[in-house]
From Swiss-Prot:
Keyword Thylakoid attributed: no
Cofactor needs: heme b
Cofactor binding mode and count: Binds 2 heme b groups non-covalently.
Gene designation per UniProt: MT-CYB
Positions contributing to heme b b562 binding: 83, 182
Cellular component GO terms, alphabetical: mitochondrial inner membrane; respiratory chain complex III
Subunit structure: The cytochrome bc1 complex contains 11 subunits: 3 respiratory subunits (MT-CYB, CYC1 and UQCRFS1), 2 core proteins (UQCRC1 and UQCRC2) and 6 low-molecular weight proteins (UQCRH/QCR6, UQCRB/QCR7, UQCRQ/QCR8, UQCR10/QCR9, UQCR11/QCR10 and a cleavage product of UQCRFS1). This cytochrome bc1 complex then forms a dimer.
Entry keyword set: Electron transport, Heme, Iron, Membrane, Metal-binding, Mitochondrion, Mitochondrion inner membrane, Respiratory chain, Transmembrane, Transmembrane helix, Transport, Ubiquinone
Molecular function GO terms recorded: metal ion binding; ubiquinol-cytochrome-c reductase activity
Protein known as: Cytochrome b
Role played: Component of the ubiquinol-cytochrome c reductase complex (complex III or cytochrome b-c1 complex) that is part of the mitochondrial respiratory chain. The b-c1 complex mediates electron transfer from ubiquinol to cytochrome c. Contributes to the generation of a proton gradient across the mitochondrial membrane that is then used for ATP synthesis.
Extra remark beyond the main annotation: Heme 1 (or BL or b562) is low-potential and absorbs at about 562 nm, and heme 2 (or BH or b566) is high-potential and absorbs at about 566 nm.
Keyword Lipoprotein: no
Length: 379
């Protein structure tokens, strides 16, 4: 009789995805982040479910319901901070995962890459709506400013914004629908993750060299399960340090003030993981231009496979490409820093230069580096 994990219709799928999956023998720690993202998603759904049991999506009681969770609910404070800082860990893993994909040329798996970009947009939407729910000052004004960007769309913009708000300003209707969407989106994301994995398993994983690894495969379990567990322990350690020692480090102090439509905070900014895109948005003096740049800063990832000019898939043996990649990483750090600064000299010009640099590296310099490296290879 065959092993049940190989014969049972349901267990067979899990077996082929997580146990007997043939994996390249040389994938490094950079390949850990996919599983870590899965763990993060599970943690967010679980903690979010328990928070939703006590949260009320009403403008009059939302802020006090979050306070109630932290003060009166058994271990409510740890559930709340696990959820808030879990989102930060989620985005750290996400950026590293996407960075790995760019560095090692994983974007050449078109379906997997494009589903990944859809996932990225879905996660950003979910995180943004989640930030509105505690109904603090930054929640309210962040929601007002970001949703207001849609009014830049010609002709239909204003109607669209009022339709999203459910009125003439961010109010009770907005909060209620944001809570509904914030609750449902993670389950849609889970479905997309399954599709993401389905497409990945059609081709198999890429590896650091970017070469075909069919000649040298090893089973996923036990080799990579144990490696993923190590990654999970390290991530959980960092998360618990954040949650237990500095839970508010990545948050905004303004969010401890209940939302007040009559008082604008001196500096409105989103969560730290959106600051790079926010800096690109602010670097363009025109509203519509800024919104387009904001969308393109993420949508540019779709062009990655088209902009690949090198004969080699990975950046592992491409020194010029490597230099440009790490300059791009540095540029993203600068943009993140600028996004959190007030709009004044010298931050404006730094933000504009960093934004130009971001698009120039991806659209012009990286493809040119690929062509140049091809020519050097033929010498």
């Amino acid at each position: 009789m065959a092993n049940i994990r190989k014969s049972h219709p349901l267990l067979k799928i899990i077996n082929h995805s997580l146990i007997d999956l043939p994996a390249p023998s040389n994938i490094s720690t950079w390949w850990n982040f996919g599983s870590l993202l899965g763990i993060c998603l599970g943690l967010q759904i679980l903690t979010g479910l328990f928070l939703a049991m006590h949260y009320t999506s009403d403008t009059l009681t939302a802020f006090s319901s979050v306070t109630h969770i932290c003060r009166d609910v058994n271990y409510g404070w740890i559930i709340r901070y696990l959820h808030a800082n879990g989102a930060s860990m989620f985005f750290i893993c996400l950026f590293l995962h996407v960075g790995r994909g760019i560095y090692y040329g994983s974007y050449n798996y078109l379906e997997t890459w494009n589903i990944g970009i859809i996932l990225l947009f879905a996660l950003m939407a979910t995180a943004f709506m989640g930030y509105v729910l505690p109904w603090g000052q930054m929640s309210f004004w962040g929601a007002t400013v970001i949703t207001n960007l849609l009014s830049a769309i010609p002709y239909v913009g204003t109607s669209l914004v009022e339709w999203i708000w459910g009125g003439f300003s961010v109010d009770k209707a907005t909060l209620t629908r944001f809570f509904a969407f914030h609750f449902i989106l993670p389950f849609i994301i889970t479905a997309l993750v399954i599709v993401h994995l389905l497409f990945l398993h059609e081709t198999g994983s890429n590896n650091p060299t970017g070469l075909d690894s069919n000649a040298d495969k090893i089973p996923f379990h036990p080799y990579y399960t144990i490696k993923d567990i190590l990654g999970f322990i390290i991530m959980f350690l960092f998360l618990m340090i954040l949650v237990l020692f500095m839970p508010d480090m990545l948050g905004d102090p303004d969010n401890y003030t209940p939302a007040n439509p009559l008082s604008t905070p001196p500096h409105i900014k989103p969560e730290w993981y959106f600051l790079f895109a926010y800096a690109i948005l602010r670097s363009i003096p025109n509203k519509l231009g800024g919104v387009l740049a904001l969308i393109l800063s993420i949508l540019i990832l779709i062009l990655m496979p088209l902009l690949h000019t090198s004969a080699q898939r990975s950046l592992m043996f491409r020194p010029i490409g490597q230099c440009l990649f790490w300059i791009l990483v540095g540029d993203l750090f600068i943009l993140t820093w600028i996004g959190g600064q007030p709009v004044e000299h010298p931050f404006i010009i730094i933000g504009q230069l960093a934004s130009i640099m971001y698009f120039t590296i991806i659209l012009i310099l990286m493809p040119l580096a690929g062509i140049l490296e091809n020519k050097i290879m033929k010498l």
